[in-house]
Amino acid sequence: MLALKVTVYVVVLFFVALFVFGFLSSDPARTPSRKDLED
């Protein structure tokens, strides 16, 4: 039961990290100032 709970937590955290990373990486791309992304 503990392994199942740990697996669920890992999967949830993995998807949350992917969502946050995708949001942060696509956020500067929408803004006109892309110098910050290149720097």
Swiss-Prot record:
Query: Which superkingdom is the protein from?
Result: Bacteria
Look up and give the membrane topology term.
Single-pass membrane protein
Q: Where are the transmembrane segments?
A: 6-26
Q: Name one GO cellular component term.
A: plasma membrane-derived thylakoid membrane
Its GO biological process annotations read: photosynthesis
Query: What compartments host this protein?
Result: Cellular thylakoid membrane
Primary localisation category: membrane
InterPro entries, A to Z: PSII_PsbI, PSII_PsbI_sf
Q: Does the entry feature the keyword Transcription, yes or no?
A: no
Question: Which keywords has UniProt assigned to this entry?
Answer: Membrane, Photosynthesis, Photosystem II, Reaction center, Thylakoid, Transmembrane, Transmembrane helix
Instruction: Say yes or no: keyword ATP-binding present.
Output: no
What family is reported?
Answer: Belongs to the PsbI family.
Q: What does this protein do?
A: One of the components of the core complex of photosystem II (PSII), required for its stability and/or assembly. PSII is a light-driven water:plastoquinone oxidoreductase that uses light energy to abstract electrons from H(2)O, generating O(2) and a proton gradient subsequently used for ATP formation. It consists of a core antenna complex that captures photons, and an electron transfer chain that converts photonic excitation into a charge separation.
Assembly description: PSII is composed of 1 copy each of membrane proteins PsbA, PsbB, PsbC, PsbD, PsbE, PsbF, PsbH, PsbI, PsbJ, PsbK, PsbL, PsbM, PsbT, PsbX, PsbY, PsbZ, Psb30/Ycf12, peripheral proteins PsbO, CyanoQ (PsbQ), PsbU, PsbV and a large number of cofactors. It forms dimeric complexes.
Q: Which HAMAP family match?
A: PSII_PsbI (MF_01316)
Q: What is this protein called?
A: Photosystem II reaction center protein I
Q: What is the lineage of its organism?
A: Bacteria, Bacillati, Cyanobacteriota, Cyanophyceae, Synechococcales
Gene name of this polypeptide: psbI
